[in-house]
């Protein structure tokens, strides 16, 4: 049923006669004040619009160097994956954060990354990249003076954990390309497209309940290992511009490097970068029946160029230990259900490390977990690696530097209760990797 329109009659309403008001005029002073008020309101409005539209924030990058006299140089400072370099870098980066976050304004200081620690007669020299966000109308030189003033004031107060030589401090504005090149010299750093660091079955065949990757460059070390004519077989992890880390069982059926290709990017089709494989190295003591020593290396015929979307992960020091319930991430193109199809888009899942004592319980894996294996997932199941994820990375975020701690190896089905994923423990094979690659 439709509602009919309501009919109005002019005669239904009495006619109202309004008394005409006598015409009035404002005096000149009141008129002038009113005009000034309107102009002020318009001016404020234009200012606000200009602030948000014209003065968009822009990234500014600087390369700083200074001498620290309270630190004696150690040989391992020259090895970026060493515990000594990592710990000292974090100390310096925390110091820079305290200096600039308090004085640069909310959100102005973004991040710092130590690039190099080198020897000096008086201690050590530090080379570090500093990143800030300021209005685009600001100039790099003006911001540079602001940074220098803030740094010198902090040195005068003498409340820093390190003794820094004031005359040694130098600061140079750099462009985004130079900044990327410097950061690309470090491993395990993720960058967004706007050049801001991003603040997280036992066969070849194995992320259930994960999600699709949010953006290119979120997991830039992830690779797809593909058998020519058969497509995606396994995941792999970029650890240098020519070497990838993967699982030995991925090559069980075919060890001929000429039959394999490697692609990078968040999709298998189309790939972002494609490379041929020149060499395959399988651990000499790999045992397929027990899954022990399930680790292999693949060398590319042509090196890859590091960028925001293709980057190497850090190899951990052999002494790195992760306690149970440490948050880690597994990524891959594997199926999302047991025996399901490979996914074209890269997926990720957050899982937790599980102690070997728990994993070796009779109701879990009943003693099958060896020192070279690492369990991760949840005892209640639901989130896990699966078919097609094998060989891919399990990574750990240590203060925005990412380390590969596991390689997807085996498990009983996918995401079952009391059957977490089992990974090759990378720290156990750190010396083996170094002996084969020099890394």
From Swiss-Prot:
* Gene from which this protein is expressed: Tmprss11f
Q: What is this protein called?
A: Transmembrane protease serine 11F
What species is given as this protein's source?
Mus musculus
Q: Where in the cell is it found?
A: Membrane
Cite the GO molecular-function annotations of the record: serine-type endopeptidase activity
| Family indicated by similarity | Belongs to the peptidase S1 family.
Segments spanning the bilayer are 34-54
What residues sit in the active site?
249, 294, 390
One Gene Ontology term of the biological-process aspect is: establishment of skin barrier
